[in-house]
């Protein structure tokens, strides 16, 4: 029995001791506020974006120096849950995916990240001119921010966030929302 326990602990030790935070999975919950900035609609939308995001371990290390700084690429998959606080619709639920390009500073406690990607979603469309026009929509986003570890496996995130929603030309006219704002959140590494 002791030998079996020793083998289990020896095999689990490398899994528990990731050399670098980017080599582990990360689950984040972020929310914020965005305002309409485009001319795709006459409606001054305001949106509360909330995302539950899963980041994969590092897929690609572009660069690494002797002090521990790294430039890496991870996968990012998000469940988008948005409250439309100003506009004819009231919610948006979607899925999105993107690469997460991250610069990790020496010491592996702080990183800057950038993602640009897209996906699909559903909203409660109305017949209001300038509104989404149909329930099924496409999304794309850009997210630039910073992550700071505040405790073992726990980090704070904050950044600038841009999101676009439209129906991809499936209706005429093709209304869209371009919204820019900020997000803040909490991340858990496992």
Task: Indicate where each model-derived feature is located.
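Sequence/structural signature of outer-membrane beta-barrel proteins
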Residues: 34-40, 61, 80-86, 106, ...
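Short glycine/proline- and aromatic-enriched beta-strand/turn motifs that initiate or cap beta-hairpins
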Residues: 16-60, 181-190
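Cleavable N-terminal export/targeting peptides
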Residues: 1-22
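Helix-adjacent hinge/juxtasegments
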Residues: 88-116
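Residues that define the transmembrane beta-barrel architecture of outer-membrane proteins
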Residues: 23-25, 44-50, 89-95, 134-140, ...
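Transmembrane beta-barrel strands of outer-membrane/channel proteins
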Residues: 25-35, 75-81, 114-120, 158-162
């Amino acid at each position: 029995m002791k030998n079996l326990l020793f083998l289990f602990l020896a095999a689990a030790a490398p899994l528990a001791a990731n050399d670098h935070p980017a080599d582990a999975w990360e689950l984040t919950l972020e929310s914020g506020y965005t305002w309409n900035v485009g001319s795709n609609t006459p409606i001054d939308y305001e949106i509360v974006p909330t995302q539950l995001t899963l980041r994969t371990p590092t897929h690609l290390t572009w660069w690494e120096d002797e002090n521990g700084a790294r430039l890496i690429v991870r996968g990012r998959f998000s469940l988008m849950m948005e409250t439309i606080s100003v506009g004819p619709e009231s919610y948006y639920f979607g899925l999105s995916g993107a690469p997460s390009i991250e610069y990790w500073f020496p010491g592996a406690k702080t990183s800057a990240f950038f993602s640009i990607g897209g996906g699909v979603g559903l909203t409660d469309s109305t017949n209001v001119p300038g509104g989404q026009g149909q329930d099924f929509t496409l999304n794309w986003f850009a997210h630039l921010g910073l992550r700071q570890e505040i405790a073992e496996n726990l980090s704070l995130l904050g950044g600038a966030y841009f999101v676009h929603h439209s129906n991809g030309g499936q209706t005429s006219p093709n209304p869209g929302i371009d919204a820019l704002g900020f997000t803040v959140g909490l991340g858990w590494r496992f």
